[in-house]
Amino acid sequence: GMGADSVVGAASAACPGAAGDTTSRMIADRNIRNMILADGPAGLRLSRHFAADKDGNLIPGTEDASLGEMSLLAGKGEKKELPEGAVTYYQYCTAIPIATLLAQTWDVDVIAQAGDIVGEEMEELGVTLWLAPGMNIHRNPLCGRNFEYYSEDPLVAGMCAAADTRGVQKHAGVGTTI
């Protein structure tokens, strides 16, 4: 989602469905480029589709993580008509197994390969930072996000997160945010 119609967690103006972007204010005076942040503990969570006009500008409300799409699901509103020359794009990301399952393999090479898949998709889709891997330990079984964390053992959790990060960082210009 973009602008006023964005959904929390999908507010990127540069990569539809990404969690957000950093400010553009530092490009001119400090030559610091925007960073695009994508969520998703089991691979990148991005919009599966979006549309752009004939000049390549994103058309707000056409991606599947927008309020425009949600109002259609609720039975309100009408499908947005695309302007002449608009193109619909698709960006399907790989669904990586959840962290707990990856840790249960006891194989840091497999976890690094999963990170490599995510890093390749980040490069391809222009995402700079992956808001993962989740780094916590399973202290309470009532925690609703334990599936995002590798283990209740801090050593196992750290080794797994490091392997995932190594896999992602095989690709220049992308990283994780443990």
Task: Give residue ranges: language-model regions.
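Glycoside hydrolase catalytic-domain context in secreted enzymes
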Residues: 1-178
